[in-house]
From Swiss-Prot:
Binds 2 [4Fe-4S] clusters per subunit. It catalyses: a plastoquinone + NADH + (n+1) H(+)(in) = a plastoquinol + NAD(+) + n H(+)(out); a plastoquinone + NADPH + (n+1) H(+)(in) = a plastoquinol + NADP(+) + n H(+)(out). This is NAD(P)H-quinone oxidoreductase subunit I. GO terms for biological process: photosynthesis, light reaction. It is a peripheral membrane protein. One of its GO terms (molecular function) is NADH dehydrogenase (ubiquinone) activity. Keywords: 4Fe-4S, Iron, Iron-sulfur, Membrane, Metal-binding, NAD, NADP, Plastoquinone, Quinone, Repeat, Thylakoid, Translocase. Residues 55-84, 95-124 form the 4Fe-4S ferredoxin-type domain. Residues 173-194 are annotated as: Disordered. It comes from Nostoc sp. (strain PCC 7120 / SAG 25.82 / UTEX 2576). Its EC number is 7.1.1.-.
């Protein structure tokens, strides 16, 4: 009988220990459930890139003088400039200009050193395609006006992705009425005024 009671006691101890382990695991789960999400609902919410963001390059064909400075300063000699010398005007005539964004490292040297400012960086960063050859933009594709996140009525532009305010190291120290991630400054002002 003592052996049976010892087995029951050991079983009870193991059951309590198993319950503690499960409780520890669930405490971590519940701890994360109380935290605020850090995600952005991407197709419908997009972060507005910073002022100096280096996105897709915009090209103005009329300003280009075919000097090929962009090719010389590019670390990978990426822009392809095709020109011919016009004997009548004694100037270079630009025939074709293209950049392959599948290879481009978006360093911005071409934009910085262009003497006529025909190249500029845009805030467009959605360059995904199914075929890498579609990333080779010619002068027509480069000349398209850049897409702006703030102009799309179907997208909620987010100024910044807010998770923890400055100085806060533990997410559990935040008050319940703290701003959610991606809150726009206008929304924050409305909440503080209310």
């Amino acid at each position: 009988m003592l052996k049976f009671l010892k087995q029951v006691g050991d079983y009870a101890k193991e059951a309590v220990q198993a319950g503690r382990y499960i409780g520890q695991g669930l405490s971590v789960t519940f701890d994360h459930m109380r935290r605020r999400p850090v995600t952005v609902q991407y197709p419908y919410e997009k972060l507005i890139p910073g002022e100096r963001f280096r996105g897709r390059i915009h090209y103005e064909f009329d300003k280009c003088i075919a000097c090929e400075v962009c090719v010389r300063v590019c670390p990978i000699n990426l822009p392809v400039v095709d020109w011919e010398f016009d004997k009548a005007t004694k100037k270079k005539k630009l025939n074709h200009y293209s950049i392959d964004f599948g290879v481009c490292i978006f360093c911005g040297n071409c934009v910085e050193y262009c003497p006529t400012n025909c190249l500029s960086m845009t805030e467009e960063y959605e360059l995904a395609t199914y075929d890498r050859h579609e990333l080779n933009y010619d002068s027509v594709a480069l000349g398209r006006l850049p897409y702006k996140v703030t102009d799309d009525p179907m997208v909620t532009p987010l100024r910044e992705l807010v998770y923890l305010p400055k100085g806060v190291l533990d997410p559990h120290d935040l008050p319940a009425n703290a701003p959610r991630p991606g809150a726009r400054p206008e929304d924050l002002v409305e909440k503080t005024e209310a």
